[in-house]
Amino acid sequence: MSSELAAPPGVVWERIASMDGINHELSPWFRMTAPAGLALSPELVPLGRRWFRSWILLFGVIPFDYDDLCVEELEPGRRFLERSTMLSARVWEHERTLDPVGDGGTRLTDRVRFQPRIRLLTGIHRTIIAATFRHRHRRLRTHFSSTMTASA
């Protein structure tokens, strides 16, 4: 899924690389936790190994899943690749890229791959993940007051 945002990549990166920004994208449906005082600073990210466990809270309060967050690749201001395990998924892979477009805008692209622990739930997972990323992109477009349209 991709969206064009009415802000330069550096501004978009600042937003998406912060817990406040991540949780704004997910709200009001979900919230992710992080250790108190954690800085999402590129030089502090331990590439290729578990960084921390983030609880995923339904409606911001009900724990229903966790993400053992592992950032495999990081290009600050441009791209990250997360390859983690979750309570619900044996494999969770999320790649997000930022590319400059037009007159100071950014194309933000998310690519997700997952393997649920329970195969029978694959369809439900796919539906929830697609809806969640549509919601996240809508929140980002609103936040950056984009006049561009989304493409899936």
Model-derived segments and spans:
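Generic structural detector for well-ordered beta-strands
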Residues: 2-6, 70, 97-99, 113
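Short strand-connecting beta-turns/loops that link adjacent beta-strands
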Residues: 8, 76, 101-105
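Glycine-rich portal/gate segments that line the openings of hydrophobic small-molecule binding cavities
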Residues: 34-85, 146
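A non-catalytic, amphipathic alpha-helix used as a structural packing/dimerization or gating element
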Residues: 131-139
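Generic C-terminal helix-cap and adjacent flexible tail
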Residues: 145-152
